[in-house]
Amino acid sequence: NQHNEFVQSLLGPRQVAKPKENTWDGASRDLSIVYGANTEDGRGNVTAFFTYHDQEPVLQGKRDWSACQVVVSGAGVASCAGSPNSNQWFRADGQGGQLAVVGNEFVPWSATGATSPPPFFNSNEYSYLMQQSTRYTAGFFAKYDVNDHFKLYSDFSFMNDRTNVQIAPTGLFQGSGPSPTSGFLVNCNNPFMSGGQRTAIGCSADDILNGESVDMYIGRRNIEGGGRVGFYEHQNYRVVMGSRGDIVGPWKYDLYGSYYYTSLYQASQNYLSISKIQNALQVVQGPNGPVCISGGDCVPYNIFQQGGVTNEALSYLAINGTSRGAVSQRIVEGSVTGDLSEYGVKSPWANDGVAVNFGFQTRREHLEYTPDVAQLSGDLSGAGGASVTIDESIAVTEGFGEARIPLIQDVAWAQDVVLDLGYRYSDYSTGITADTYKVALQWAPIDDIRFRTSYNQAIRAPNLLELYTPQSVTNTSQVSSDPCAQGAPSPASLAACLNTGITAAQYQNIPQCPSGQCSVLTGGNPDLMSEEAKTFSIGFTLTPTFLNGLTASLDYFTIDLEGTIGNIPLGVIMQRCLETGDDAFCSQIVRNPVNGALFGDDVAAGGYINGANVNVGAGTTSGVDVQVNYNLPIEMIGLEDYGRVSVALNGAYLIEATTIPLPGDPEYDCAGLFGPQCQTVNPKWRHQMRVNWTTPWDMTFSAAWRYIGEVKLETDTQEPTIGTGATNPFNHTLPARSYLDLSGVWNINDTFTVRAGVNNILDQDPPLVNSRIAGTGLPNTYPTYDLLGRKMFIGFTANF
């Protein structure tokens, strides 16, 4: 059901269609088959499987809360916004103001103007909230025991998935043109322009006579051609072959090799060619009508008047792109396990001896990516700039050892005291070497309770994608305006702006970032080092004999992370550069070298803030995990004839989630907060609680309560770096969300089972968030929450 009346009230003024009050969509279908058989001699077994999954898409425009991009002004006034890359023109030198096409004239652009295309483009009408996908998997697990020394095993799996992605139409995007300023050149004697249009963009009589060109930033959607479509296909293979068994005495071995391969085919369809757009805008009057200056098969592109675009022009401009890639992994691992009690190696106070395991692993991973010529050249308008070819590998060799040492057993107040030790040495081909280890202790004073504590020092080396993902330029709402450009809502001083790479003449004359989004460079960094983590935990498990059926555990943990792989928050880069002029920050601001703009879509052309992966600062996360399982003794109240009832609770309390963005910076704590720097929703408490009733009538009913606690906006706090102490009138707090799921299973007989249920039965919408705060790629909220609403399902199982 559509029941967000607040967002619905914003749709009308922007001429956005309201979704149907009741919508059924997002259907999915699943099929799985499992077959198993034993060999005649009883020493082998094979289990084979096949699965099929098909998911129908859901458009963002089919939910009222996501039907448009909700933005909120500083005064707390909400409205439906969108991209001015719809019908907005202005000179690349910033002179002359913003214009829109109406009829065959330029008029001053207005956010509320009635133009076609409209002043703001609503991309949500085209984009998916849930993508379409089709997936097949198949494989087998096999084993055969030749004898006690050779127990052979093998796994094989195959997966194919195909996804169609739709996003808003391509077009001409401000800052994506081929001119030195990343604009498009429009010749003043273009016959499609009226006299008023020539005057509006600053063409003089001599300019018209000589055919001079004006460098323009043009935002104009290809509404005539429809949305862009992306097709992705992955094929995945994994094979494992190994042997395990006895060596001699207490010693056993396990040796295996595995190979993993995933291929990618990607097609980008219904795009326009940037180079052809430029050709089609350079038009003069020929003997039989307007013709392109470039000649050849070029067809003039008339975007200077409403209804001027022809199908012939669209056919000329159309371009598709394809790319292929693959990721592979090879592993060889061997280990030996032994119980040293046979040699008398044990504690004098324990019954069991020391158990050890040691071994090695070699692993090699390879990444390759090959775009076609169109994507290599960056000619697809709206595709994020030029792609690059990748052919990179990582290799690692590791040796490890573990020991389990029972210290005390079966004595008063020490039923079991066990020490676990582990060590691993890793040598990466990227130059990283690491010694990691763990120490853990368990103590069970009585059978009813077991205490545990552990300390681990570990690393996470950067993976192939973090190292070698191609760098590209895209839009970001983390920095929604350039404080040194025209019309900045909070302009910085000239002295501060000089730090960011502008000239005094450019101050407040630079074109402003369109659509409330400046540009960011994202991608890999081959110079990354490993993350280092130190983890401490302490907890207990309670299984009281005086309360049969109860199992409860509680664990406190703290994780200290250094050298986190991520990016410096873009707002921090801009603010620190303005305030300090520190080159560590200012060098990350790469302006367009011609006009100083901070937007574009090409790495070489500049106009972005560097948000590529780096090893940034440090952080600490601590909290408490809680698990409770209880089989209720309903027989004690005379209900034994009604089956069994069980309750399970899994919860987490977040004590702190601190971040030090850069060495020497003050830390800020995101526990209980959300926002651009905290990046996601960090509730202090969340849980899932499930109650199962297993009846004596071959039916089981289940109710689950999913809870996400309240969070506050980071800027409304006094946290260093991220807090301002102000109160946001719209998003001060995101209230707690509770979801109720109901399901049931009916075992009709030994062969047939039916299951059905409803998730989010109360149809809770996600909380509404200013889209310039969320910055998640989703409209107006975070993916932490349930996005689709009430979901019903039914399934059928047959065992033969």
Locate the predicted segments by residue.
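Gram-negative outer-membrane beta-barrel transporters
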Residues: T551-T715
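Outer-membrane beta-barrel translocator/receptor signature
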Residues: N1-Q60, D64-S66, Q132-A138, H149-F150, ...
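Residues that define the transmembrane beta-barrel architecture of outer-membrane proteins
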Residues: D25-L31, Q132-Y136, Q235-Y237, S328-V332, ...
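Transmembrane beta-strands of outer-membrane beta-barrel pores
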Residues: N1-Q2, D41, Y52-E56, F158-R162, ...
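Surface-exposed, low-complexity loop segments enriched in small/polar and acidic residues
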Residues: Q55-S73, P84, G94-S133, G139, ...
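C-terminal beta-signal and terminal closure region of outer-membrane beta-barrel proteins
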Residues: A267, S275, N456, T469, ...
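C-terminal beta-signal and adjacent terminal beta-strands/loops
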Residues: E562, I655-T658, R706-Q718, V745-F800
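Short loop/turn motifs that connect adjacent beta-strands in outer-membrane beta-barrel proteins
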Residues: E40-R43, N147-F150, D246-Y253, S341-V354, ...
